[in-house]
Amino acid sequence: MDTLIAQLQRRFCDFTISLYHQGFLDDQFTELKKLQDECSPDFVAEVVTLFFEDCEKLISNMARALDQTGNVDFKLVGSSVHQLKGSSSSVGAKRVKGLCVTLKECCDSQNYEGCVRCLQQVDIEYKTLKAKLQDLFNLEQQIVQAGGRIPQVDI
């Protein structure tokens, strides 16, 4: 059993490090992890789940607004992307946050094609991050269920 725990912990550390090295996460995610303790072991997963729900709503709102060809409310899209950038920043979603900056610039210049293209990239990046973080949280659960502790990962 100890070998299984050690293998899971190693996979967890390697996977976590890869998320930082590939630019999916930044130091804010590390800060968020520091707020998690024995009293609130699911804190990060809960915060990230709320982030995912926010992302889906905001991306959907922006897609609907951009669907109004010839009558796009760029202020609405800009407001939604600003919220998404803030949410992304608060959980350490580095790539999503970076794309939000570009999308905001497209909104500010009322570049319709740029907005559509950037929003598609945001959606892809969000879905990729969601899958990766769900894998990370699943690894955490496997470690705990095997009787192990989640290792501290130094980036």
Curated annotation (Swiss-Prot):
Subunit and interaction comment: Interacts with the B-type response regulators ARR1, ARR2 and ARR9. Binds to ETR1, AHK2, AHK3, AHK4, AHK5 and CKI1.
Taxonomic superkingdom: Eukaryota
Q: Give the protein's biological function.
A: Functions as a two-component phosphorelay mediators between cytokinin sensor histidine kinases and response regulator (B-type ARRs). Plays an important role in propagating cytokinin signal transduction through the multistep His-to-Asp phosphorelay.
Q: Which residues carry this modification: Phosphohistidine?
A: H82
GO MF terms held by the record: histidine phosphotransfer kinase activity; protein histidine kinase binding
Compartment(s): Cytoplasm, Cytosol; Nucleus
What domain comment accompanies this record? Histidine-containing phosphotransfer domain (HPt) contains an active histidine that mediates the phosphotransfer.
Pfam families hit by this protein: Hpt
A GO CC annotation recorded here is: plastid
| Post-translational modification comment from the UniProt entry | Two-component system major event consists of a His-to-Asp phosphorelay between a sensor histidine kinase (HK) and a response regulator (RR). In plants, the His-to-Asp phosphorelay involves an additional intermediate named Histidine-containing phosphotransfer protein (HPt). This multistep phosphorelay consists of a His-Asp-His-Asp sequential transfer of a phosphate group between first a His and an Asp of the HK protein, followed by the transfer to a conserved His of the HPt protein and finally the transfer to an Asp in the receiver domain of the RR protein.
Query: InterPro entries from the entry?
Result: AHP1-5/YPD1, HPT_dom_sf, Sig_transdc_His_kin_Hpt_dom
Indicate the segments forming the HPt domain, all copies: 40-147
What keywords appear on the UniProt entry? Acetylation, Cytokinin signaling pathway, Cytoplasm, Nucleus, Phosphoprotein, Stress response, Two-component regulatory system
Q: Which GO terms describe its biological process?
A: antipodal cell differentiation; cytokinin-activated signaling pathway; embryo sac egg cell differentiation; phosphorelay signal transduction system
Q: Which gene encodes it?
A: AHP3
Q: What induces it?
A: By salt, cold and drought stress.
Mind telling me what this protein is named?
A: Histidine-containing phosphotransfer protein 3
